[in-house]
Amino acid sequence: MLVSALWLLAQTCHVLTASRLVQPLSEAPGSMTVIDREMIKASGFRTIPELMRLVPGMYVGYADANRPVVSLHNSTDEFAHRMQILIDGRSIYLPPFGGVNWADLPLLIEDVERIEVVRGPSSASHGANSFYGVINIITRDALSQDGGSLSVTGGDASDMSARFGKSGEKLDYRFSVGYRSDQGLNNSVLNDHNATRIFNLRSNYHPNASDSLDVQLGNSNGGYGLGISGRPEDAFRETTAQSDFQQLSWLHLWSSEHESKLTYSHAMRNSTDPHLCIDSNACQGLYSSSSIFFLPGFTRQEVYSQRNEIELQNTHQLGADNRLVWGGGMRRDYADYPLLLVQPRTLAPWQIFAHDEWHITKAAVLNLGTMFEYNGMGHKNNSPRAAFNYHLTPEHTMRIGVSTATRSPVMAEAYMDANNTIFGGAYVPPVTALTPEKILSQEVGYLGEFRAQGITVDARIYIDQVNDMILVDKWVAPSKGGYADSYKNLVSAEFRGVETTLKYRWNEGRSFVTANYAYQRASAALSAFPTQYFNSAADPSDPSVYSSIGDHVRRFYQSEFIDQFGQTVLTNSGSLLFSQSLADAWQFSAGYYFRGTVRVIDVSPDVTPEYRMRRLDLRLAKTIRYGKDRNIEIAGVVQNITQDDYTKYGTVNATAEVLFKQRTYLTASCNF
C-alpha cells in the first residue's frame, strides 16, 4: 500500500520541503521551522501571513495596512519576490510582479495542516526565486474531514466558513466555503478594509494500492480598499481581485523502492485598480482641471496573469543507505499589464533537478542536490547545494551547509516600458541586460532532541552574500522636471545572523511552549553605477541643492539606500507561543511577538520607520462535546492586549490614527 507522506510528516520532526524527500529534521539539508495544526489554533491568528510571526527572523508587514508582506532577511518591498511560496509543493508565485497576493489567496486557514519554512536559499530543490527561503503550506488531506463543520467570527473581524468531507473505500473529498473581512485600522485615514469570498476543494481517488489521483480546486473573489485621506493623487477607491487554481497529481508506486509523481497545475489572477495615479502633478491639480476624477494623470489599471506548469518527480531507494529524487518541469507564464508592459508577455522556463541523500555511516549523512534551469529570458542557471549532518549522539546533531540560489528578474523589471505611458513622453531609459540575482549561503546548525524531556533546541549561524541585486535605476527626466525609474543590477549585500528555537511539550503533548529569537545584521554597497551617476548636466528639480543630475543620483543612492540598508532587517526579533490544556476542556494560550524598528525598502525615507513591536495576544477556548466526534468550541481572542500600539508597513507617517491597536473577536465553531 502507498505510505501517506502526510502521515509520516505528522510524526515527530519529519519534513518534506528541504529536499523533496521525507526526512527527519535532524537529516534535512537546511534550517527549518514547522508550524503545526496545534500551533495554528493556539495562536488565534485569522490569516496565514500572521502565522509567519512564529518563524525566527521573518518580517511580516502590511502594505497600507491591508496587503500582507512576508519575507526573510530584509523587509523587502510590497511584492517580496525573493521568497518562494508553495501550497502542497505548487508555486503560487505569479507574474508580472512576482511575489504572492496573500490577501486573496484561495485557501482558508482552517484547511492548513502544517507549514514548513526553509530558512535559507533552496533553489536546488524549488528553483529560482527560492532566494531567501521557502514557505510550503501543506493543506489537510482529503480524508481529514469526515462530516461537516461551521465557524463564525465576530467582533473586530467578520469571518464565516463551512466545511464538509466524506471518506470512502476509493474516494475521499473535502470542500470549504468561506468569507473573510476586516475593516482595517482606521478608515478615516486609510482606506484599508478588505473582504474575500473563498472556495476550496480537495479530492483523492485511490483505485488500488499502487495509484492515487489527487485533485485540488480553489477560487477567491473580493477586493480591498486603497487610498490615503488628504492625498488627491491617492484618492479613496475600491479594487477588485479574482484568483483561482486547479491542480491534478498522479502518484504511482512502481515498487516499494520506486515511486513517480506527475503534477499539472494552472493558476490565474485578475485585478483592477479603477483610478490609479500615474502623474502626481496632474493628480494633485497642478495642471488645469476642475475635478480630481477628470484630471489627466489617472488611469484604470488592469492586471491579468496566469501560470501553467507540469512537473514529473521520481523517488528511488537505491540501497539501504541511499535515496535519490530527480525530475523536471516546464511552465508557461503569461501577463497582460498594459500600463507598464505595453503588450502581453509570455515566458516559457524549464528546469531539471536531482537530490541525493547518502548515509555514509549511522552518524554521518550527506545531502547533495542541484537544479539546472532556463528562466525564459535567455539565462541558464545551476544552483547546487551541499549539507553534511553528523549525529554526535542520537539526540545531538551538527550540520554544515553551503548553497547557492538565483532570482530571475520578474516581468515588471525586465520588460518595463514606461515611455509614452506614464511619463507623458519623457524619455525613460529602457531596461537592458538584467541578469539573475545570485546568493551564496553558508551556515552551521545544531539540533538537540531531548525526547524523554519533550524538548527540542534548534540553532544556526549564517552568512548570506548577495550579488547583482536588482534595484531601481533612478532617472532624472529634465523634460518633466521630475524623475522616472528603470531597473538595473546595482547592489551587493551581506546578511549575517543567528537564529534559535526552543520547543517544550508536556501533559502528553497537549500543552507546549515555542520560543524563537533572531539577531541579524546587513550591509550593502553599489556594485555597478546607475545610468546617470556621472551626469554633469544641471538638475532641473532643485538646482539650488544639487550641483548636477549626477550629484542628485549619487546622494539618492548613498543616503536613501546604502546608508539605510542596515535598518531594513529585523535586528532583534522573536516570538513566544504558550498553550496550556486545562480542566473541563478549557484551553488557554498566549503569544508574545517583538521586533525592533525597521524600515521598508520601497517606502520613502521621509516616512517614519515602523515602530518597534511588543505585542501580546491571549486566547481562551472551551470545548463542549455532544456526541461521538462532535463538539462545539467557543474561543475568545484579544490581540495586542497591552495596547503597545505599533505601525504596519505603509506609505503614510504613523499617527495615533494609523496604529495597530487592541482587537477582540469571538469565534464559535461546531462539528457535525
For every predicted segment, state its role:
Residues 165, 204-206, 400, 512-513, ...:
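Conserved C-terminal beta-signal and adjacent last beta-strands/turns
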Residues 208, 319-321, 342-467, 579:
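Structural signature of Gram-negative outer-membrane beta-barrels, strongest in the C-terminal barrel
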Residues 320, 325, 359-363, 461-465, ...:
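Gram-negative outer-membrane beta-barrel transporters
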